[in-house]
C-alpha cells in the first residue's frame, strides 16, 4: 500500500514537469511596424511575444483591435517574421522599483539599464501610468527658479513648478541652450528625456552638458531616432513618472525633454499605422489629446514639499511658429522661449527672441520693480530693432523722438546683456542687478 502511494506521488510530481499547451495566435499581416495577429486576444496596453525565424521572441504591445484581429506594435525592429509566426501572451510585466539608487543611471524606455552598471532595483513601486494631480490640490508656482541664463532670469523669469517650451527650428541652438540650463540650474534631481534625437547627442549631452558631477544627481532616459515609435512614447512617459517620484520625495526636480515634437511624431506614426485619419499637417487627432496629458503630469504636486519644473524643446519645422505642434504646445505650456534663426545667423547666442517669448508665471515669482524694468527693456529693444536698418541709410535723425534716442543710446548695452557665452553663468540676483544698472 505504502509503495503504491509512493509511486502515485512520484507520478503526480512528474506531471508537474510536463509542459502544457500554450495559448497562442498567429501573424496574418505585417505592415511597416504594425503587426496583425489572429487568435491571441489581449487587452490594449498588454504585451505579447512574437516568435521570429531564429526562434527568438519579439516583445510587442497591443495598440488596438478590429473584430478578431489584434494590432501589435513591437518595441524593437522585427527581424525574420513570416505569415503564421506564432504569437504568445506575455507574462505580466514586472513593475519597476525605484529609489535614490537610480541617480546616475542611463536607461531606455522600459527602464532597462544602458550603462552596463548592473540591474536597477529599488524599494518603491514606480507607477506605469502617467502621474495625475487633482488641479484643486496642485501647489501654485510662487518661487523663482534660477536657470543661470541672464536673459531668462531677468526678462522671462520662470518659477519652480513651471512648464516651459523652447521653440526653435533645426540648428538654431536648442540643445546648446538646454545644456546651459542643465549645468546652471540649481536642482536636487535632474531627469533628462532624450526622445527621438540623434544617437550621437546622447553621449555628448551626458559628458558635456551634465558632466560627471551633474550625472550623480540625474537620471537619463534615452530613446534615439532609430528606436521604434512605441519605445519613444514609453521613454517620454517614463521620464515624467521618474520626475514625479523624486518630486514627491521632497526634491526640487528639473525635467528636461528633448524633444516634445519627436514624442508627437512617434504617436503620429502609430496612429497613422492604425488607420486614424490625418488632420493638420498629417497629425491625427489623438496626438493633440496625448500632448496635454503628458505635459499635465509635470509641474508641482499636492504636497507642500518638492517641485517639478519642466523644460521641453519644440521643433518648429521650417521655422514655422504656427506649426500645429508648436501651436498646441504654446497653448498648454506655462510659457515659451522662442529662438530666432536671424539672431543665430549673426552669431548672437543664446538666440532668444525676447519680443516673441513669454513666461506666464513671471508676475507670480517676481517683484513689481523687476516687472517694470523687464517691460522697459523689451520696449527699448523692440524700438531699436524697428529702426536699426534705417540708421546706415540716414533714415534716423537724433532728437526727433526721445524713446528712439534712448533705444539707440542703450543698444550696445542691451545687446551685451542678451548675449552669453556657453560656459558663463549668471545667477538670478546678478542678472536683476545688471538689468537695473543698464536702465537707471
Can you describe what each PLM-predicted range is?
Residues 7-12, 88-90, 147-152, 239, ...:
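Phosphate-interacting basic helix/loop segments used at nucleotide- and nucleic-acid interfaces
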Residues 23, 58, 83, 102, ...:
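Residue-level signal for beta-strand positions within conserved beta-sheet cores that form or flank
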Residues 23, 31, 44, 102, ...:
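A generic structural signal for well-ordered coil/turn residues at beta-strand boundaries
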Residues 29-31, 39, 52-54, 64, ...:
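Flexible glycine-/small-residue-rich
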Residues 56-59, 94-98, 113-119, 136-142, ...:
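Active-site phosphate-binding and catalytic loops of NTP-dependent enzymes
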Residues 85-87, 94, 114-162, 175-180, ...:
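P-loop NTPase nucleotide-binding/switch module
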Residues 154-155, 161-440:
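P-loop NTPase catalytic core
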Amino acid at each position: 500500500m505504502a509503495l503504491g502511494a509512493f509511486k502515485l506521488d512520484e507520478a503526480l510530481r512528474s506531471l508537474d514537469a510536463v509542459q502544457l499547451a500554450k495559448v497562442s495566435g498567429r501573424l496574418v499581416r505585417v505592415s511597416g511596424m504594425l503587426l496583425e495577429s489572429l487568435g491571441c486576444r489581449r487587452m490594449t496596453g498588454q504585451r505579447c511575444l512574437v516568435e521570429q525565424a531564429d526562434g527568438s521572441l519579439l516583445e510587442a504591445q497591443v495598440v488596438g483591435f478590429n473584430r478578431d484581429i489584434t494590432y501589435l506594435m513591437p518595441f524593437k525592429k522585427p527581424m525574420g517574421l513570416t505569415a503564421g509566426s506564432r504569437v504568445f501572451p506575455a507574462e505580466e510585466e514586472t513593475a519597476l522599483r525605484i529609489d535614490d539608487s537610480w541617480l546616475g543611471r542611463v536607461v531606455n524606455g522600459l527602464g532597462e539599464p544602458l550603462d552596463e552598471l548592473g540591474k536597477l532595483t529599488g524599494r518603491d513601486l514606480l507607477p506605469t501610468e502617467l502621474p495625475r494631480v487633482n488641479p484643486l490640490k496642485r501647489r501654485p508656482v510662487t518661487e523663482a527658479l534660477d536657470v543661470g541664463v541672464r536673459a531668462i532670469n531677468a526678462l522671462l523669469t520662470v518659477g519652480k513648478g513651471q512648464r516651459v517650451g523652447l521653440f526653435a527650428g533645426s540648428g538654431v541652438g536648442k540643445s546648446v541652450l538646454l545644456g546651459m540650463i542643465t549645468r546652471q540650474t540649481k536642482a536636487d534631481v535632474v531627469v533628462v528625456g532624450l526622445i527621438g534625437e540623434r544617437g550621437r547627442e546622447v553621449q555628448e549631452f551626458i559628458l558635456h552638458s551634465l558632466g560627471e558631477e551633474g550625472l550623480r544627481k540625474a537620471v537619463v532616459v534615452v530613446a534615439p531616432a532609430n528606436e521604434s515609435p512605441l519605445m519613444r512614447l514609453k521613454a517620454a512617459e517614463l521620464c515624467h513618472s521618474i520626475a514625479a517620484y523624486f518630486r514627491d520625495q521632497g526634491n526640487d526636480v528639473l525635467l528636461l525633454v528633448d524633444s516634445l515634437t519627436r514624442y508627437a511624431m512617434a504617436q503620429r506614426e502609430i496612429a497613422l499605422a492604425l488607420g486614424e485619419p490625418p488632420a493638420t499637417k498629417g497629425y491625427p487627432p489623438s496626438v493633440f489629446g496625448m500632448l496635454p496629458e503628458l505635459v499635465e503630469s509635470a509641474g508641482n504636486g499636492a504636497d507642500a514639499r518638492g517641485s517639478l519644473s519642466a523644460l521641453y524643446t519644440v521643433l518648429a519645422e521650417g521655422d514655422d511658429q504656427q506649426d500645429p505642434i508648436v501651436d498646441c504646445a504654446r497653448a498648454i505650456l506655462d510659457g515659451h522661449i522662442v529662438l530666432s534663426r536671424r539672431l543665430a545667423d549673426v552669431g548672437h547666442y543664446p538666440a532668444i527672441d525676447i519680443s516673441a517669448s513669454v513666461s506666464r508665471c513671471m508676475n507670480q515669482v517676481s517683484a513689481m520693480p523687476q516687472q517694470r524694468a523687464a517691460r522697459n527693456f523689451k520696449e527699448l529693444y523692440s524700438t531699436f530693432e524697428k529702426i536699426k536698418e534705417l540708421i546706415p541709410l540716414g533714415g534716423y535723425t537724433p532728437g526727433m523722438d526721445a524713446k528712439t534716442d534712448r533705444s539707440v543710446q542703450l543698444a550696445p548695452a542691451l545687446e551685451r546683456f542678451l548675449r552669453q557665452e556657453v560656459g558663463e553663468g549668471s545667477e538670478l540676483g546678478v542678472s536683476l542687478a545688471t538689468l537695473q544698472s543698464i536702465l537707471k
